[in-house]
Amino acid sequence: ILDYPEYSLDMFFEGVPMLRSFLLAPVSGNHDSLYAVRRRLPMAGQDARTGNYWFVRAGVLFIGVQIGDRYFPNHTDFMASVAESAPEHNWTVLLIHYGLRSNGVHGHDAPVIGFRDTLEPMMDALGVDLVISGHDHEYNRTALLGGDAPETDTASILYAQPGERIYITLPSGTGLKYYDDSRSADFPFTAEGLEHEPGYVFFDFSPEEISLSAYSAATGEEIDAVTLRRGAPITEEE
């Protein structure tokens, strides 16, 4: 969060020894005024105009969208180029700071809606399975959205059809800032929590499924868990 005092950056670098063991895929937030100065992303899939990027790891296509460029046709062009260039993969994940489908306080902000209206048709074309966001400093997860998905589905295993995806809003990882509770979305959610406490989310990818588990950082309690698969559920008769 780089337009805040320099000590906030110092806090991040305190974790560098541990962070060296992780693959980091940062995307710019609404306070990242020096994002390009502080972060170097040496990837062949990086777009010179927007700073957007993509890469494939372990069969997963990750697409990072930077919110600093609000000339939306640039993002449309970038997504089209990813569709043409990305190699074969099992799953597609979009990373963006704004919660495109969030039940938090910023869910109806104009920039959020602008990115949502721009990116969702391209997500359909790319077959995006999972959208991971932040910005609202609380955890929430949508039902499967798009296609013929039911309005609510609280099952622990979800079966996505073409055009369907899950949206995840990550909680605050540090507890430095929270918003008052806001429930203003007009689309369905199946999990919410961690409005005023830090948390974290684990994701596990295999060729057959994506599994995620969300936890309270204070207590270690699991507050949400779901597995995403493709196609129709297998019945006992099958």
Each PLM stretch: what is its role?
Residues 1, 86-108:
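Short acidic, glycine-rich surface-loop motifs adjacent to enzyme active sites
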Residues 2, 6-92, 113, 118-119, ...:
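Extended active-site neighborhood of metal-dependent phosphoesterases/phosphodiesterases
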Residues 29-30, 97, 134-135:
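Active-site glycine-centered loops adjacent to acidic/histidine catalytic or metal-binding residues
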Residues 55-59, 104-106, 207, 238:
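Residue-level recognition of alpha-helix boundary/capping or hinge positions
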Residues 133, 141, 225-227:
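Residue-level detector of high-confidence beta-strand sites
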